[in-house]
């Protein structure tokens, strides 16, 4: 029974000495600081500066100690890695969009090329090596002079020119 009494009194003394700060003592602690400081009996400025030194807006540099792990530091590292990964994915997505736009712009608007420039476009496309060969082949095939549609339009022009010359004579 005596042992139980000693244990109970020790527990009560321990609980009262480790009680959180009273409202009077809390007035010195600002609201933007972590609430963990309210659990301590005494203020330890070195500990507060070390813990608060890792916040995003602070310019305080913290020296690394071997063998110590910090939850805040690990979260900063993970946050930086996630941000770098998101930036990398966005860059890849933007690069793919740029490539798709480039391919689209190479194919669009090439069908309305004047007849006099058709040979130049065919030669410049054939001399260029691009990894998008099927797209170039379709464009070249449409513009080439051996194309029956292209040859037919030339024949129509020649017929009209000859008819105009005959009228003038």
Swiss-Prot record:
Modification Pyrrolidone carboxylic acid, positions: 97
Residue ranges annotated as propeptide in the record: 19-96, 109-169
Coiled coil: 83-108
Subcellular location as annotated: Secreted
Family label: Belongs to the sauvagine/corticotropin-releasing factor/urotensin I family.
Function: Regulation of fluid secretion.
Protein name: Diuretic hormone 44
Organism: Camponotus floridanus
């Amino acid at each position: 029974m005596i042992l139980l009494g000693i244990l109970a009194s020790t527990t009560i003394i321990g609980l009262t000495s480790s009680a959180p700060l009273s409202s009077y003592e809390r007035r010195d602690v600002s609201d933007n600081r972590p609430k963990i400081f309210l659990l301590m009996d005494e203020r330890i400025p070195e500990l507060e500066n070390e813990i608060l030194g890792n916040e995003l807006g602070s310019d305080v540099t913290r020296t690394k100690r071997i063998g110590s792990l910090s939850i805040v530091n690990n979260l900063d590292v993970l946050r930086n890695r996630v941000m770098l990964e998101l930036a990398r994915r966005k860059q890849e997505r933007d690069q793919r969009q740029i490539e798709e736009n480039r391919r689209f712009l190479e194919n669009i608007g090439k069908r309305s090329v004047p007849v006099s420039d058709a040979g130049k476009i065919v030669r410049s496309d054939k001399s260029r090596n691009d990894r998008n060969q099927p797209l170039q082949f379709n464009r070249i095939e449409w513009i080439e002079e051996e194309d029956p549609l292209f040859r037919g339009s030339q024949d129509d022009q020649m017929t009209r020119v000859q008819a105009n010359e005959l009228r003038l004579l």
